């Protein structure tokens, strides 16, 4: 094996970087030299894997308040292609400079980190695609089920792309499979999972202990109450009205409620916090899910997989189109309930929890999905697939 060099490219977002951390650690343990360009926020997380973080500047601002405004104003969403053109123009030269004299033997790139794909093409290096969400083929695409995923460039955006420093880039490339595609979910959760060929390896969630998220003081009390976790993730959480609904819905109930409200909301800003509530900006989600009996989530793929891996029924309140697909999938597979955000009230939250909590059919489906997740193999299976690809038959 020697000390072959693997480079991992991603975007600066927890929902994309977190699924890769256990895989990164596994590759390092197997003797590979792994480099991972990240922004300042993720340096510590990458260092904990044993990989070498390389610093770069990004134009993407994953600010929850701005994201909420974007989601409310669909017209602003049409600016997304320009944001990605700007990001690739900013990032690609930095990556070229970082790797010009230190070319990797293999590149792994998140499906949204298109600069990684372009760099692989420029250097003539084989690349493996990482899917932190659904895989797509002729039977299942985001675009076929939601108009919001169809990317049609305006004349202004077409001009911006033509005048950019990017090689012949096409936004449709984001949906094109590579020779090997690592998908961080079990095949049983993927719509039309049986139709995906040998290029797709469904490894399930790649989970690792996250020291960078640990808290010194325990969050879960020994009150004996069942634990409910409420979290809308790290990017789509600027929704104070939702948290007030949760307080109204579960005040003085049997639940010990742990609620993560994100970094744009001050936990002290809530008046009259019930005795059975604990409110924080961030929580060690994996640790809490080990003891939780119910998870109210935004339906992000990371959170969904973490909840299912821990055997926790879900109530999903999606904040964007991809999460809407996941929330529907959770309900159709009998793993929990789906609430439309615009219809969410304290009463509907109570009702969804009441229908999910302790339901033997839901618990059975959850246990079945846990088995699928375990059988998928996680980070070690992903590393096995990458090693096989890197062997002489794959990368010369």
Curated annotation (Swiss-Prot):
Keyword hit for Transferase: yes
Biotechnology: Such glycosyltransferases with substrate flexibility and less regioselectivity can be utilized for glucosylation of a broad range of pharmacologically and industrially important compounds. Glycosylation is an efficient tool for generating biologically potent and diverse novel natural and unnatural product glycoside compounds with enhanced drug efficacy. For instance, generation of novel resveratrol glycosides could facilitate the development of drugs to treat oxidative- stress-induced diseases and to provide antiaging functions.
GO molecular function annotation: hexosyltransferase activity; UDP-glycosyltransferase activity
Pfam families per UniProt: EryCIII-like_C
Catalytic activity annotation: an NDP-glycose + an acceptor = a glycosylated acceptor + NDP
EC number: 2.4.1.384
GO BP term (any one): antibiotic biosynthetic process
Gene3D superfamilies: Glycogen Phosphorylase B
InterPro entries listed in its UniProt record: EryCIII-like_C, Glycosyltransferase_28, UDP_glucos_trans, UDPGT_MGT-like
Top enzyme class: transferase
Lineage: superkingdom: Bacteria
This protein's record includes keyword Transferase: yes
SUPFAM superfamilies: UDP-Glycosyltransferase/glycogen phosphorylase
Binding site for UDP: 18, 234, 283, 298, 302-306
Key words of the record: Glycosyltransferase, Transferase
PANTHER family named in the record: STEROL 3-BETA-GLUCOSYLTRANSFERASE, STEROL 3-BETA-GLUCOSYLTRANSFERASE UGT80A2
Family: Belongs to the UDP-glycosyltransferase family.
Function: Glycosyltransferase that can glycosylate a wide range of substrates, including various flavonoids (flavones, flavonols, flavanones, flavanols, chalcones), isoflavonoids and stilbenes, to produce multiple glycosylated products. It can accept diverse nucleotide diphosphate-D/L-sugars as donors, including ADP-, GDP-, CDP-, TDP- or UDP-alpha-D-glucose, and catalyzes O-, N-, or S-glycosylation. In vitro, catalyzes the glycosylation of, among others, apigenin, 3-hydroxyflavone, phloretin or resveratrol, resulting in multiple glucosylated products, along with mono-, di-, tri- and tetraglucosides.
Name used for this protein in its record: NDP-glycosyltransferase YjiC
Organism whose genome encodes this protein: Bacillus licheniformis (strain ATCC 14580 / DSM 13 / JCM 2505 / CCUG 7422 / NBRC 12200 / NCIMB 9375 / NCTC 10341 / NRRL NRS-1264 / Gibson 46)
Lineage: Bacteria, Bacillati, Bacillota, Bacilli, Bacillales
Gene: yjiC
């Amino acid at each position: 094996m020697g000390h072959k060099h693997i480079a991992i490219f991603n975007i600066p977002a927890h929902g994309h970087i977190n699924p890769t951390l256990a895989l990164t650690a596994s590759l390092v343990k197997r003797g590979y030299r792994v480099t991972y360009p990240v922004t300042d926020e993720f340096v510590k997380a990458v260092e904990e894997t044993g990989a070498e973080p390389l610093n770069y500047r990004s134009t993407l601002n994953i600010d929850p308040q701005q994201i909420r405004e974007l989601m409310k104003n669909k017209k602003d969403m049409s600016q997304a292609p320009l944001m990605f053109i700007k990001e690739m123009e900013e990032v690609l030269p930095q990556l070229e400079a970082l790797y010009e004299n230190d070319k990797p033997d293999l590149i792994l790139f998140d499906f949204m980190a298109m600069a990684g794909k372009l760099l692989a093409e420029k250097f003539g290096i084989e690349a493996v695609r990482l899917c932190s969400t659904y895989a797509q083929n002729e039977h299942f695409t985001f675009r076929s089920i939601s108009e919001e995923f169809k990317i049609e460039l305006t004349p202004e955006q077409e001009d911006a792309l033509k005048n950019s420093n990017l090689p012949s880039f096409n936004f449709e490339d984001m949906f094109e499979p590579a020779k090997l595609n690592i998908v961080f979910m079990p095949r049983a959760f993927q719509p039309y999972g049986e139709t995906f060929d040998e290029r797709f390896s469904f490894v399930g969630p790649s989970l690792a202990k996250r020291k960078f998220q640990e808290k010194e003081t325990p969050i879960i009390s020994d009150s004996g109450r069942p634990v409910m976790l409420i979290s809308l993730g790290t990017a789509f959480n600027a929704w104070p009205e939702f948290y007030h609904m949760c307080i109204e819905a579960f005040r003085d109930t049997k639940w010990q409620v742990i609620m993560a409200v994100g970094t744009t909301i001050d936990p002290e800003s809530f008046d009259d916090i019930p005795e059975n509530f604990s409110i924080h900006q961030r929580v060690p989600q994996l640790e809490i899910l080990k003891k939780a009996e119910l998870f109210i989530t935004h339906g992000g793929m990371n959170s969904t997989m973490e909840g299912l891996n821990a055997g926790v029924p879900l109530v999903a309140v999606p904040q964007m189109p991809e999460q809407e697909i996941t929330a529907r999938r959770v309900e159709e597979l009998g793993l929990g309930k789906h609430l439309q955000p615009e219809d969410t009230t304290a009463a509907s939250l109570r009702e969804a929890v009441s229908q999910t909590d302790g339901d033997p059919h839901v618990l059975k489906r959850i246990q079945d999905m846990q088995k699928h997740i375990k059988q998928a193999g996680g980070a070690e299976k992903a590393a096995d697939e990458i090693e096989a690809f890197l062997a002489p038959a794959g990368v010369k």
